[in-house]
Design a protein with these regions (language model features):
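Sec-dependent bacterial lipoprotein signal peptides
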Residues: 1-17
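Domain-level marker for long, solvent-exposed, non-transmembrane regions
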Residues: 19-189
Length: 189
């Protein structure tokens, strides 16, 4: 994983150093950036408690279980949806407007070693949680984290970091004004 990051940063450094003439290099720079396919701009590590209290009025006893899990979620720009028509140069080559795809979750990892059973209580005539019930509970927790991603601010951070990246990249290529917009910006809705 670190090797990918080093290669990416070497690639970006090479691009930044090789930018001389605006128009000619813009197409080269953006084509090389798009060839990366995904631009991961932010990574969150989230710890969540997943719990259930299985109260069945017709059964005697309690069933409770609590898991803690640590997940890693990366967000950024999927450059497969980016085309050169999304770049407009105006003001005689001084200003460039880049219209990027809206950020999305690029990877989500809830590794088995990061899931811990914190508490389990079974009393009365109840049976323990079986493997399928535990897996279903963990899947519900995963869905809850993904559904709450917007409230966590990961998309806002991904937009900010992508904006900073493209502004720095295109400023190094000689553009005085760089404006970065996002297609389908959900914050406008």
């Amino acid at each position: 994983m670190k090797k990918k990051y080093w290669l990416f940063f070497l690639f970006v450094g090479w691009i930044l150093c090789s930018c001389n003439s605006n128009e000619k290099k813009l197409n080269e720079v953006l084509a090389k950036a798009v060839s990366c396919a995904e631009l991961g701009t932010v990574e969150y590590t989230i710890t969540k408690l997943i719990m259930t209290d299985d109260d069945a009025f017709y059964k005697f006893g309690d069933r409770k279980i609590i898991f803690s899990c640590r997940t890693t979620m990366k967000a950024g720009i999927d450059l497969k949806d980016f085309v050169m028509d999304d770049v407009k140069v105006t003001d005689g080559g001084k200003t460039v407007v880049v219209n990027l795809p809206y950020p999305k979750i690029l990877s989500f990892n809830m590794a088995a070693e990061d899931i811990k059973l914190e508490y389990s209580k079974v009393s009365g005539l109840r049976t323990s949680f079986n493997t399928d019930e535990r897996n279903d509970l963990l899947k519900q927790g995963e869905r809850a984290i993904l559904e709450d991603a917007h409230n966590l601010g990961i998309y806002d951070d991904a937009k900010k970091n992508a904006t900073d990246f493209f502004k720095a990249l295109l400023t190094q290529c000689g553009y005085e004004n760089v404006n970065v917009c996002f297609k389908g910006d959900e914050s406008k809705n």
